[in-house]
Amino acid sequence: MAIIVEHDKRRKQILDNALIVFMDEGFVNATFQKIADQCGIARTILYLYFKNKKEIFNYSIKQLLLNVEENINSVRSDKSLNSEEKITKVLLTIFKLLEQNRQLLSVVLDYLVHLSKEGVSPEDRVRRRTVKLRHILSSMFIEGVKNGELKKMKVKAADDYLYSFIEAAIFQLVVTKRKNLSELRETAIFAIKQLSL
């Protein structure tokens, strides 16, 4: 049992250190050797845990998204908030996490461009990584409609509406290099109020 725990602990440490390398170097310039050096281990040891840098990158992003989902689920389960407040708080929490991980977002964009050049659809990768987040947004909307707190509309339309704020946030931070999302925060708050009864 201790061996499994140690293996999982080492794997998590590798992922944490790999994120640092990806943020410093970008996806294309990050190498297995640089990740091993950051971890303080030999490259051959790194191969015991991961087969290549793409696998490390995917697991690193997955780990980050799990942390995001934990934050969001804690808001979602807060009984003291109504549906409008929950959705607003979730979007604002996501905005804050995106601002804190601006550099990582640039690496993700770099990775998606790299995939596209390899002939792999970035859209499929993004959809797979964001399906849980979209599900959480949809379920909060459905709950709000059932509770009589939000206007009725098609769930997919509501999901797309809410998710578009996240896409706008990423675009503003990575492509237009905005320093913060203060204007988008105000717009999102206003827009979510329009969903309320």
Regions found by a protein language model. Give the residues of each.
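Helix-turn-helix
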Residues: A2, Q13, V21-E55, Y59
